[in-house]
Amino acid sequence: IYVSMEGKKAPSEPQRYDAVLGAIGRVPNGKNLDAGKAGVEVDDRGFIRVDKQLRTNVPHIFAIGDIVGQPMLAHKGVHEGHVAAEVIAGMKHYFDPKVIPSIAYTEPEVAWVGLTEKEAKEKGISYETATFPWAASGRAIASDCADGMTKLIFDKETHRVIGGAIVGTNGGELLGEIGLAIEM
């Protein structure tokens, strides 16, 4: 497959690739739920807006999962369900989506957690990155997994890790370590 690219740093000639990952995404069905009959507001894209305790604009109605927004991941929805149940039971819990791991189960795996560079820019965070090629890791070489890399995104002022990505065999299994670094 040959791909032509655009942009300041784009190569002038089409580039050859052996494989392409196509991802089309998902669409919420908030408009199909007739949530408006209960007074629940649905935005133009079909999402139901909630607060940090998963309450909708109708205080006794909660919403969780794909219908409340990105990322549309099952483990996020399960955690939101736990938070909503705890709030309904009278506890003062809330949902903090800062560390939600995402993994594309491709070969090699592509995994990320925390803020991306784009999100850091949008939030006005001054950041730096550090990248480690797996070809420099004896363990990766010995495991025949040297085709990969780990990238960390950290706050330039505090030096705290705010995000990271891993591309490589079983990269998703290492993602928890970056998530832990973000939360510490």
Residue spans for each PLM region:
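Conserved beta-strand-loop-beta-strand element in the redox core of flavoprotein oxidoreductases
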Residues: I1-P14, V20
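Fold-independent oxyanion-binding glycine-rich loops
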Residues: M5-E6, A23-G25, A38, K52-Q53, ...
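Internal hydrophobic alpha-helix adjacent to the cofactor/substrate pocket in enzyme cavities
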Residues: H75-K98, I125-S126, L180, M184
